[in-house]
Amino acid sequence: MMILMEYHNPVLLKESVDGLDVKPDGIYVDVTFGGGGHSKEILKRLGPDGKLYAFDQDKDALENKIEDGRFTLINENFRYLKRFLRFYGIKKVDGVLGDFGVSSHQFNEAERGFSTRFDAKLDMRMNQGDKLSAYEVINEYEEEQLKKLFWAYADLKNAPKLARTIVSERKNNPIETSEQLNDLLKPLLFKGKENKILAQIYQAIRIEVNQEIEVLKEFLLQTEEILKPGGRLSLISYHSLEDRLVKRYIRSGLFEGEPEKDMYGNISVPFKKVNGLIIPSKEEIQQNNRARSAKLRVARKL
């Protein structure tokens, strides 16, 4: 087994698990198992009759499986949350925790292709069994598709130029590695900010490869169905697109627009937020730089 903290240093560990308000005999779900840090903390707070189900689509995470009779690890994408809980006979749960984004392990494993720091084949699949990889996005997407994803997922003003340059280059030779992609795009980026903007470009490609926005929406809609009244939702986001969806869904049960009012002017929403936005302390950011962009939102099912 890998040392959990080496695989992924859990962010906002105490705060996110506190948000679940764990009942000793409750049923909980950690939808982003990773290195198992959050799951271990939940298990510490569960009694002998409590249950914890965890999801992770990355086979590497299976090496961190916790040997505990109260724990079940499901090697699937959390977009299938309800389906696989029902397979285990679970229809309602007391709390759901999610720590979205890429694990430290995935960033640090060069061959996974998530990081701008290493030269590797363009991949970025969280589930290595999926067909779509960064290679297909970069080499097969139309120019308009590339432009849209750079705009939508990275908010890049020079998205048209980036897309045009990629399409022009691949006519001669396929773009197969991160080093090729970096060398191609760096001259188009603001001097002194090349690495930051490259990271945004990689984020956009990764979101597309793993359908992260669609997956998050599907997951959030299911939480309303599976949480018991009073059950808790504790979710950590790392970029504004994710956080905006989580915030809107908690507030209104919708991803856009406003909920309809009844004839008396009342609105019906599935959740009530618990406290406000929680961000990491300066101390945590110093110890774990990846925590710097984390945002935790907690809600209670009505």
Swiss-Prot record:
EC supergroup of this enzyme: transferase
Residues binding S-adenosyl-L-methionine, per UniProt: 36-38, 56, 84, 99, 106
Subcellular localization(s) per the UniProt record: Cytoplasm
EC number: 2.1.1.199
Annotated catalysed reactions: cytidine(1402) in 16S rRNA + S-adenosyl-L-methionine = N(4)-methylcytidine(1402) in 16S rRNA + S-adenosyl-L-homocysteine + H(+)
SUPFAM superfamilies per record: Putative methyltransferase TM0872, insert domain (SSF81799), S-adenosyl-L-methionine-dependent methyltransferases (SSF53335)
Any single GO CC term annotated in Swiss-Prot or TrEMBL for this entry: cytoplasm
Gene3D superfamilies per the UniProt record, alphabetical: Putative methyltransferase TM0872, insert domain, Vaccinia Virus protein VP39
Keywords on record: Cytoplasm, Methyltransferase, rRNA processing, S-adenosyl-L-methionine, Transferase
Function: Specifically methylates the N4 position of cytidine in position 1402 (C1402) of 16S rRNA.
Name by which UniProt lists this protein: Ribosomal RNA small subunit methyltransferase H
